[in-house]
Amino acid sequence: MIKNKFVRFLVLISICCLYFFSRLQHLTSIPVFGDEAIYIRWAQLIKSEGTLRFVPQTDGKQPLFMWVNAVILKFFSDPLVSGRIVSVFAGFGLIIVLFLLTAIFLSYDSKEKDIFRFLRQSIIDNFYPSIFTSLLYILIPFTFFFDRMALADTLLSFFGALCLFLVLLLSKFPRLDLSLILGFALGLAWLTKSPAIYFVVLSLATFVFLNWRQPKSFFLPIISIFIGFLIYNILQLGPQFQMIALRNKDYIWSITDILKHPLDPLKPHLIDTFFIYNKYISWPLLIISLAGLILLFIKNKKAKNLNYKYLVLICWWILPLIANAAMAKVFTARYILFTLPALIILISIGFTNFLNKIKSNLFKILLLIAVFILNINFIYKISVDPFHQKLFSTEQGYLTDWTSGWGIKKSADFLKQRAQIANVIVGTEGAFGTLPDGLQIYSNKISHLTIIGEGLGFTEVPAGLVDAKNHGDEVYLLINKSRLKINSNQLNQLKLIKSFDKPDDDQLLLFQL
């Protein structure tokens, strides 16, 4: 018994070490991405000035991720590391929740009446299937990629999985304390990103579905939703709360538009989902898991064991996915990341059931290697050499185009050195995004260094930069070659100081006036 506990303890420690090693190695090999630059810059502003804690709302974004990042910024000198660490720890919380979620899901039909004994027995009985779920999360490129980005999506996924875990517990043990905790989880999810509304609807639907014979207990999830709504309305303390709803309209089609063309964008977005799953999960894993689930359902049907609880996982995965595909104007992998926890549990259960049908341990090992070798290879390459990697078309902006920040940190290092001996003024392309925010995060609170976003499409050197030069300042212009529109006469008057290659044959150019 003691030996078994020690082995399980070692397995837990190994999973934790594997997670942190996989997420922290080469953490900044991918340069700052446009949205990362914006979120980190907001966090810096919040950290430096408390009255700006609601500044993300000016662009219609909920601020929880930035609030957490503002705290973490105190412990790291590199702002990009600070922002990405938030996602790393959100992902770590997610593997813990997935472990617990798998355990209680597999034991959901238990007759145990005490919640703590139920949790303990579920973990003991389903330890290794639950560990496999956590391992699966670590080895899927989909989750690996976004756990290492300073974006709010992994944090949203964590709260989504936590809400699913809590509503399953609440459904089995209808208690007011669980209802209150679920309400706080829903509220925090809502403070993270707008898609948390799916968790609100699904939590209520899940409870009603699993407790339809106990209508007197339906008030519990309603209390949860009420608490979540109260927490969300904290945002009304800040200015421009209405911008959240207005900006949401920029990302989704209205119901009227959807009814006019119900298959567009639904069909192309579902096709994109097919390729995203192929690239970032792998079809061998999905096909084997599906086969395992079918075998499990056939076995349960013969034993007259209903598979109703699996409908909960399927709905938490497929309904938000279809809703996003039908409504989203812009569709990328990160916008469906929050649907993955339920899918990962289904994959884990199906795959382990398929493995259990195989008698040869050698064949099991060979199958595991064959299924995961491509995923591990992708993880290695995107970590060590992202410059030469190709992502699916919906994700290319992380490595190519103006949204990728190749050369920005090196430009900032050079400019900070110059600021020690001169008053430096830097004009950049853009007014919001990778530039100038990407440069500002690396030069925050640096004396004698001022960064100005000059917008797009200018054909002459901005007058403000010329004036600064005439007043004796050291003046620079940072711009992507693909966006350089300055006429040849003025371009000849600029001195190219540095250039940084980008994977799409573009360059980031640093000129001095």
What would you call each of these model-derived segments?
Residues L106, S110-D114, L119, I123, ...:
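Membrane-interface transmembrane helices that cradle and orient dolichyl/undecaprenyl
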Residues P63-W67, F76-I96, F146, A150, ...:
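Loop-to-helix entry region of an early transmembrane alpha helix in multi-pass inner-membrane enzymes
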Residues L367-D505:
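Catalytic lumenal/periplasmic loop and adjoining terminal transmembrane helix
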Residues F6, Y128-I131, L166-G187, L362:
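Short hydrophobic alpha-helices at membrane interfaces in multi-pass membrane enzymes
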Residues C16-Y19, S130-I138, F165, L186, ...:
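Short helix- or helix-capping micro-motifs
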Residues R8, L12-C16, I223-I227, N300-K301, ...:
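Signature aromatic-anchored transmembrane alpha helix within multi-pass, membrane-resident enzymes
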Residues Y39, L188, I197-K309, I318-P320, ...:
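Transmembrane-lumen/periplasm boundary regions of multi-pass, lipid-linked membrane glycan transferases
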